[in-house]
Amino acid sequence: MNSLLFVYGTLRKHEKNHHLLAQSACINEQARTKGSLFAAKEGPTVVFNDEDEGYIYGEVYEADELCIHKLDQFFQGYHKQTVFVETDVGIKIALIYFMNKDGCAGFTKISSGDWKEHQMISKSKNPIYYFAYGSCMDNARFQKAGVDHYFQDPVGRAVLKGYTTRFTLKREDGSRADMLEDGGTTEGVLYRIPYSALSYLYKREGVESLTYRPAFVDVEAGGRHYKDCLTFLVLQKEAEIAPPQHYQIEIERGAELYLSPEFTEKLKRHMNSLPKG
């Protein structure tokens, strides 16, 4: 019998122990559950306690009994239980491997709850491939902020499968762009940026204020496959409303410069079809 499994840390896509899931189908790339992530000696590990306010970010897989048996061996000394996992298409119940709090005494807590982001920051990864799908496809605000030099090396139009561009971040003047992992296909601009550009992007996207969160996706651009590209997703998603005109202009300007005419028209039609807030 197959089970849903929530994985984090080195079991995630493109990480060093992902081969243990080689025969398992990925159900959700963007998933989270309540808890704390620690950088333990043998690798990242999850801890649950009553005070947990944060989330652990990972992926959901459908695993058979053989896969679960292999993971039981890999996670010797760990505990296993089912948890509620949040995805863009609803709540799921999945197995997770975790440690007791005492087992992580002295280990560093990964405050973001995201192993991929922790790796990017701790290794000062350079360059970074950044997938922009909203107003960052346009360079007007880059120039105004004096940071356009960070974005002078665009790879160009990129296609992301499994996601759809939506407008779920509600503001007083209208919405802002987001992506939902709902099985669709979307387009954006892939930039090659230096590590030093992150401070600007994190501030603009409101990472500290929990507006958007860093996430990682695989895209196709110029006939090549780019793995673990940085992007930003809305944390508190609401029903879609129309974006304000000034924001829509930025999106359309960037889309017309980089994206396919068919997708650009589709995106315009969608924005124009949304109700005013």
Curated annotation (Swiss-Prot):
Pfam families: AIG2_2, GGACT
Keywords of this entry: Acyltransferase, Transferase
Reported function: Putative gamma-glutamylcyclotransferase.
GO MF annotations, alphabetized: acyltransferase activity; gamma-glutamylaminecyclotransferase activity
Family: Belongs to the gamma-glutamylcyclotransferase family.
Disulfide bond entries: none
Keyword Cell membrane (UniProt): no
Protein name: Putative gamma-glutamylcyclotransferase YkqA
Gene Ontology CC: cytosol
Record field: transmembrane: none
Organism taxonomic ancestry: Bacteria, Bacillati, Bacillota, Bacilli, Bacillales
Catalytic site: E205 (proton acceptor)
Binding site for substrate: Y8, G9, T10, L11
InterPro entries: AIG2-like_dom (IPR009288), GGACT (IPR039126), GGCT-like (IPR013024), GGCT-like_sf (IPR036568)
Top EC class of this enzyme: transferase
Keyword Secreted: no
Gene3D superfamilies assigned: Gamma-glutamyl cyclotransferase-like
E.C. code: 2.3.2.-
